[in-house]
Amino acid sequence: MAIKAEEISALLRSQIENYESEMSVTDVGTVLQIGDGIALIHGLNDVMAGELVEFHNGVLGLAQNLEESNVGVVILGPYTGITEGDEVKRTGRIMEVPVGEELIGRVVNPLGQPIDGQGPINTTKTRPVEKKATGVMDRKSVDEPLQTGIKAIDALVPIGRGQRELIIGDRQTGKTTIAIDTILNQKDQGTICIYVAIGQKDSTVRANVEKLRQAGALDYTIVVAASASEPSPLLYIAPYSGVTMGEEFMFNGKHVLIVYDDLTKQAAAYRELSLLLRRPPGREAYPGDVFYLHSRLLERAAKLNDDLGGGSITALPIIETQAGDISAYVPTNVISITDGQIFLQSDLFFSGVRPAINAGQSVSRVGGSAQINAMKKVAGTLRLDLASYRELESFAQFGSDLDEFTASKLERGKRTVEVLKQDQNKPLPVEHQVLIIYALTKGYLDDIPVVDITRFEDELNHWAESNATELLNEIRETGGLPDAEKFDTAINEFKKSFSKSE
């Protein structure tokens, strides 16, 4: 079969016309040194600060130290497969994490990869992990309450949407319990919760996830877990990943609650990275920018103005102290950044006062304007009553004779402490809180034995659910305080049926 010359030339012409020259230029470098999750790279002359670089085995790294002749990279994953002389290439992108509704109900690592064994997360939207905080003019004053369901907090140190409220205390004083209870109380409140576990044991993270699942709270919660077994870079970026996921909801007009549990471990991970990168150490061996580490994170919590949709991120950072020392470097830094703190005391915890909140050292600098009117009115004198009780309590230990007024103050104080106690995983709706605190401050509990206070409260709540629904609904729907007459009638009626212990 003869092939004509014209056919050959036409075939060649079509091939040449369809030919596309694909030439890609990749900036590459070479690993000079590797160890402890840090790689020293020669080359990569045009790499950006915070840019992702890719090693030959697919593991990613984050460019941190940009020096004259080399680049210090922290490795975001296992580094045992990387050796000296390996090739490293730029990706041209800064670190991003997946965001969106698809993440709700899932447990992910700080890179946004699922670790709960429930398959891939089908979202294509991403956001950069490092982002400038919302500007001054885009914000609005905190004016909406965020109910925690914990009497001692909602009455004494109220939290508003868009606030940063620090939870601080020694280990084993109930810090995580307060955070988890607050998440449980957001059910049916239209709030999306993000729980960031930093440097905790895998078993602890699993227990908290199960607690959330059993209470049905995973339906509106994302868990970002960087456990103690993970490399330091993942512990360092975990909070930023969490708040990035939250910002997606905030900018869509939704309300977000984010818990960082805890930032002490994040600061320790950052200290480790900084020392390995040979950055000069400062106080307590932390690098000079450890304040900025936390301020740029916590400033991303905000209440947006109405033009931007009125969304919010409320942050509850947790800090662990050593022997109650809140004057250490990281605690003082975070106290100065946040809008108040809830201080948990181990002495109170071990004496059975749980949550072990020290009312004297706990404060909410902006939450007062967000507190509902009903609570503001009934709990107005509570802090003062507690303070005077603590003072009189130490005075009464000397066993001197007490006048009638002092004795009544002490008795009221004992009942106040008892009312503010609360079991874990049992958040209380705000209308029930107002009811029991009203009964306390108006003297209705003065004739109830201290041992009966908890039972009195439980039975009052059950009784009110069926016999004082109008009263509860009025508080829930309007936020205002009903007539004193309605309260007095309801409480007196219940007291007739309540039997005191002998």
UniProtKB/Swiss-Prot annotation:
Keyword Ion transport: yes
Location of this chain's protein in the cell: Cell membrane
Pfam families linked: ATP-synt_ab, ATP-synt_ab_C, ATP-synt_ab_N
Function according to Swiss-Prot or TrEMBL: Produces ATP from ADP in the presence of a proton gradient across the membrane. The alpha chain is a regulatory subunit.
Organism listed in the record: Staphylococcus aureus (strain Newman)
Family note: Belongs to the ATPase alpha/beta chains family.
PANTHER family: ATP SYNTHASE SUBUNIT ALPHA, MITOCHONDRIAL (PTHR48082:SF2)
SUPFAM superfamilies: C-terminal domain of alpha and beta subunits of F1 ATP synthase, N-terminal domain of alpha and beta subunits of F1 ATP synthase, P-loop containing nucleoside triphosphate hydrolases
Predominant location category: membrane
Binding site for ATP: G169, D170, R171, Q172, T173, G174, K175, T176
EC number(s) reported in the record: 7.1.2.2
Keywords, in A-Z order: ATP synthesis, ATP-binding, Cell membrane, CF(1), Hydrogen ion transport, Ion transport, Membrane, Nucleotide-binding, Translocase, Transport
Site location (Required for activity): S362
Family matches, as Gene3D superfamilies: 2.40.30.20, ATP synthase alpha/beta chain, C-terminal domain (1.20.150.20), P-loop containing nucleotide triphosphate hydrolases (3.40.50.300)
Highest taxon, organism lineage: Bacteria
Top-level taxonomy: Bacteria, Bacillati, Bacillota, Bacilli, Bacillales
The keyword ATP-binding appears for this protein: yes
Subunit structure: F-type ATPases have 2 components, CF(1) - the catalytic core - and CF(0) - the membrane proton channel. CF(1) has five subunits: alpha(3), beta(3), gamma(1), delta(1), epsilon(1). CF(0) has three main subunits: a(1), b(2) and c(9-12). The alpha and beta chains form an alternating ring which encloses part of the gamma chain. CF(1) is attached to CF(0) by a central stalk formed by the gamma and epsilon chains, while a peripheral stalk is formed by the delta and b chains.
The protein, known as: ATP synthase subunit alpha
Gene Ontology MF terms: ADP binding; ATP binding; proton-transporting ATP synthase activity, rotational mechanism
Protein's membrane topology: Peripheral membrane protein
Cellular component GO terms held in the UniProt record: plasma membrane; proton-transporting ATP synthase complex
Catalytic activity reported: ATP + H2O + 4 H(+)(in) = ADP + phosphate + 5 H(+)(out)
